Structure formats: structure tokens, C-alpha cells
Amino acid sequence: MTIIRKSHPLFKIINHAFIDLPTPPNISGLWNFGSLLGMCLVLQIFTGLFLAMHYTSDTLTAFSSVTHICRDVNYGWLIRYMHANGASLFFICLYIHIGRGIYYGSYLYKETWNIGILLLFLTMATAFVGYVLPWGQMSFWGATVITNLLSAIPYVGQDLVEWIWGGFSVDKATLTRFFAFHFILPFIIAALAMVHLLFLHETGSNNPLGIMSDYDKIPFHPYYTIKDLLGVILLLLLFLTLALFFPDKLGDPDNYMPANPLNTPPHIKPEWYFLFAYAILRSIPNKLGGVIALALSILILAFLPYLHTSNQRSMMFRPLSQVLYWTLVTDLLLLTWIGGQPVEPPFIIIGQLASILYFSIILILMPTAGLIENKMLKW
């Protein structure tokens, strides 16, 4: 008799995706972040659901409803801080996941990679609209500044901004629709994550060597389920330490002040996970140019499969590419720091140089390094 997990129409799908899935035997801990992202998404959906039960999306009561959650709801403070810090955790995992994909050449699975980029955009959109909901000072001004960037689009820009706002400024209509978007988007992300997995399982997982491993596979369960479980435990340890001991470490103190359209905060800046893109935006003195650079800073990921010039897939045995890769990582950390600084010397020039370096490494230096390494292998 066939085991039920192999014959049942529903269990069969789960079996092929998580139990009997043929997996390369040499994938490292960096491959854990896919499952950790899944865990983060589930965590965010559940904590978000409980927060939505007590939250009111009205400009007059939004701020006080968040206060009410923290003070009066049973474990409301914990749910709120888990949700807020869960977003940071989500982006940490997301950036490491993308970084691993770049290092080991996973972007050559084009369908999986492109859906991943779409998932990144949707996650960023979800985080942005979610940050507006507490209706603090930084929520209000962040929403005003970022949505206003769309007015740089020729002809339709201003109409587009007013259409998103639902009026002539960020107000009740904006908050209500942002709450609606923030509620629905995670479910769209979950559906797309399934498609992401579907395409990944068509080709099979990549591995650190970047070579085909079809002749040498092991089942996902029990080997990688145990490995993923270890990752989950370690991540939860880090997460709960952050949420319970340092709940406001990654937040902005300005957001503890109710939104006031008549009083601008001294430094308007987004959450830490958007600072690198914000620094690129600010490094160009032209509004439209800045918006284009901002969009390209993420969209550039879609060009990676076409900029791959090396004969080897992975960077594991490519020393020049490795140096450039870690320079890129350092550059992104530098941009993140600059994004949180005021617009004044020497931060302006550092931001501009870091932005130029970011695009130069990806568009020019990495493809050139690939060609040089090909030549070196022939000598």
C-alpha cells in the first residue's frame, strides 16, 4: 500500500515540496533564509491580524488605538513590538537571502529570481504603508515625502499623488487605504512565495559550488528540516531578545509624537531597511533623477542574469568577484549610515560617491571581473 503522503492529492504536493524534495547535499546555512522568510511572513500575518482587531484606521483615533493596544490589551505591547521588530527581522533575512543569491549565482534561475524581485517590491510596499498606520510624526511626514516623489513623473505625477492620497494632502482617506493595502498585501506575498517555490522546484536548488548536482541528491526531510529548525530557533532567540529587551532600538522616537501637519520633524527619514535607497535618492540633486535612481537601485537586480559574464556560476572560486562583492556589501552599509544622516557636508559627497560606486560595481566592475577571471583560467 502506498504511503498516504505519496498518494493523497493534497499531501502529495506538500510531500514533493517539503519532504521527498531532492536537495543538493552541500548547501550551507545561507540556504536557511528562505525558510526563515516563510517563518517571518507567518509571524507577521498572525501578529498583524491580532493588531488589526484593535486598531482603528481613522486620523483622530489611530494614534490612541495603538496606545490602547500597548496599555489595555492583554499582551498587546508584546504583539505590537513583535510586529514592529518582525519587519526588521524580515528585511535582515531578505537582504541576506538576496546577497546569497548574488554570491552563488542563483539569479541565473531567471523565473525564480524575477518573482523574488517582485516579492521584494511588494514587501517594501507593505512595510512602507504599515509604517504610516501608527500615525505618529514620522509616519505622517514619511508618507508625505515618499508619496510626493511620484509628482516628479512628467505630466501625470501630480494627479497620481492626489489619487494615492485621496485628496490634496495625506489625510483620513490616505490612512484608510494604506490600512487596506497593508492588510491585503501580505496574503499576495504569501501566494507569490508559493509561485517562487514552484519555479525553484522546477530547476532544483543551486549549491555553493554552482555546479549541477542531479547525480547526488538527498531528501529534504529529515536532513534539511532539522537544519531549518536550528535556524528558526537561533532566529527566534535573536528576535525575542530584540523585541523584549530593545523594542524601540530600531524605531524612531519621533513616532511617539502624534502626527502634526503644522510641525515638521528635524530629520525626516524612513526605517533603517530603506536608508540605503533613501541615500541614493538624496545623492542626486534633481527630483526626477533621484526617483529614477531610487527605482533603479532595486530594479538593477533584474539585470544581473544578463550581466553575468563568468564561465563559473558561483563566486566561490573567483577572487576578483569576491573582493567586488564584499566591497558592494560595505558600500550598502555605508549608504545605510548616510541615509540616516542630515543633508550637510561631508555626508553629501560621501553619499554621492557611495551611490556611484554601487551602480559601478554592479553594471561595470563585476562583469569586467568575470571576463578577466575567464582569461586567467585559460593561462
Curated annotation (Swiss-Prot):
GO cellular component terms, A-Z: mitochondrial inner membrane; respiratory chain complex III
GO biological process terms, semicolon-separated: mitochondrial electron transport, ubiquinol to cytochrome c
A Pfam family of this chain: Cytochrome_B
Positions annotated to bind heme b b562: 83, 182
Record's bilayer topology term: Multi-pass membrane protein
UniProt-annotated binding residues for heme b b566: 97, 196
TM spans (from-to): 33-53, 77-98, 113-133, 178-198, 226-246, 288-308, 320-340, 347-367
Cofactor(s) in the UniProt record: heme b
Keywords: Electron transport, Heme, Iron, Membrane, Metal-binding, Mitochondrion, Mitochondrion inner membrane, Respiratory chain, Transmembrane, Transmembrane helix, Transport, Ubiquinone
Highest taxon of source: Eukaryota
Membrane among keywords: yes
GO molecular function, one term: ubiquinol-cytochrome-c reductase activity
Cofactor note: Binds 2 heme b groups non-covalently.
Positions of a ubiquinone binding: 201
Subcellular localization, as worded in the UniProt entry: Mitochondrion inner membrane
General function of this protein: Component of the ubiquinol-cytochrome c reductase complex (complex III or cytochrome b-c1 complex) that is part of the mitochondrial respiratory chain. The b-c1 complex mediates electron transfer from ubiquinol to cytochrome c. Contributes to the generation of a proton gradient across the mitochondrial membrane that is then used for ATP synthesis.
Family membership noted in the UniProt record: Belongs to the cytochrome b family.
Further remarks about this protein from its record: Heme 1 (or BL or b562) is low-potential and absorbs at about 562 nm, and heme 2 (or BH or b566) is high-potential and absorbs at about 566 nm.
SUBUNIT field: The cytochrome bc1 complex contains 11 subunits: 3 respiratory subunits (MT-CYB, CYC1 and UQCRFS1), 2 core proteins (UQCRC1 and UQCRC2) and 6 low-molecular weight proteins (UQCRH/QCR6, UQCRB/QCR7, UQCRQ/QCR8, UQCR10/QCR9, UQCR11/QCR10 and a cleavage product of UQCRFS1). This cytochrome bc1 complex then forms a dimer.
The protein's name in its UniProt record: Cytochrome b
